[in-house]
Amino acid sequence: YTDSPDLAVSDWLKWTEDGDPYWTRFYAENSREMLYDWVIDLGVEWNRVAMGGFENSLPRFHFTEHGALDVVQALVRTVIGLPTVNFIWNKRVESILVDNSHVTGVEVMDVRTGETRTLKGEHIVIATGGFEGNLDKVLSNWIPDLPKPERLLIGASVHARGQGLDLASAAGAKISNLNRRYIYTNGIVNIRDPEGVMAVTAGNNDSMRVNTDGVRFTNEGGFDKNILKDMLSLGTATYWAIFDEPGRAGFAMRGAEWVNTPTDRHPLLDNPMITSKSMTLEELAELAGIPADRLVSSVARYNAMIDAGEDSDFNRFPEMNNIPPRIERAPFYAMQFYPMTRKSMGGVVIDADGRALNDSGQVVPGLYAIGEVTGSAGINGKHGMDGMFLGPAVVTGRVAGRTIVAAHAIRDEKIRIRTPAAEDPLPDPSSWVPTLTEDELGTLLTTSREGYWHFETSHEMVLERQYGCTQCHSAEVPFFPLNNRTSKSAQVELCSNCHGRQF
């Protein structure tokens, strides 16, 4: 097939309805050089390309073997190796400093000790992501013309709270379109979350979807923005995916650390807290709390349309090769789904150079924003596109970086780099041994400590998967933090022990 920037722009603007025309075209014309080729030079291997969502008339959604992990690892691995880049770990920005309308630095707090300090800089780049982990902020900036769901799950990072937006606004930046977001319709409750608000992304292409009345209500394979509208119009904004034993193989999920077994054999399918399971449809309906006669009738009609090769209700399978399997062989399954937050599509308004703008459209001197905190520069418009969040984050980041370098070049001056602290020495490999037992680690995890979220989450997985200490730790990565680039580089390579796993 033959693709072109013009065709990509046409496809994307049609889908998003009002995506930012400048950034849409810029991405179409420059993402090959600024993203695809660039990360290849950093060691990333693209291994397949797919259509992605319905927004593409040709395959454009590129994948690596382990997803975003491969790209993130390559970027972090590269930047850690740069002697001119300094890292300050476990700090949270409390405020952006402004002097005479110019941004001059940040006030930060150590999340473990509470100590504060000031960091000065002529150019401050906000790259804090969206706010889809903040339900209060999401619901107070809800999508116009769509009903608010009774129950909305969090499908974004627990750290996506929107602090970067608040910081930017306080520094004078304009914030827009906070009521635009990519809501997924396939969220199930994360059984590991005691509050029942965190989601896992799941789905089954071999299922049919019914509402609380047991009636099929949407084209399961249709446009996700149409499915969202159908789902939120249900009143209760929840549905059940109905499938049978052969259809169990169609189940898939992602987005949780504990997803570490082949999904068609995952115990979640046999967990009554998430999945109702029965030898008859009547009993299944009773377990799920939906009318039995309507569920039985809906399945019978669904099977009849499959036999006829025509979905006269929702046109799910207009072509014979897209026909899903019948639902007929016990045991039968019903899995309840809810809408879930995912990605922010509004945020800090920026210009073509990645500089933050104020309410008057003027540059906020010294302030930049990139990625999801800008709503991906408005590329996604009103309707999100697959693969169009990580990519624009990289591209807008590079745009801002080039702008900063150019600003110094115009003034014919070097960028001032703070002299890094002397590196800590690595332990002697010949004498290094693990010093923490499994019981001691378990005891350490019984109490949550401020600033140790990643430590606690990762080590809970260590105990669950029965990893030995040397799965991750060595003389290069000892049991205590080191200010040492060799150690940090070694840590980067360990991310795949938990993330991006393939089964």
Where are these regions (language model features)?
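Conserved N-terminal/central alpha/beta ligand/cofactor-binding core
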Residues: 1-86, 90, 136, 209, ...
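Helical element adjacent to the flavin cofactor pocket in flavoenzyme catalytic cores
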Residues: 63-122, 165, 169-171, 349
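A glycine-rich dinucleotide-binding beta-alpha-beta segment and adjacent secondary-structure elements
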Residues: 95, 294-377
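Glycine-rich loop(s) and the adjacent beta-strand/alpha-helix scaffold that form part
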Residues: 115, 119-188, 387-399, 403
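An anion/pyrophosphate-binding glycine-rich loop and adjacent beta-alpha core
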Residues: 165-167, 171-290
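Helix-rich C-terminal "cap"/substrate-channel and partner-interaction subdomain
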Residues: 236-332, 400-403, 407-410, 414-427
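C-terminal structured subdomain/cap of oxidoreductase catalytic cores
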Residues: 249-258, 268, 346-410
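Sequence context of c-type cytochrome heme-c attachment sites
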Residues: 423-489
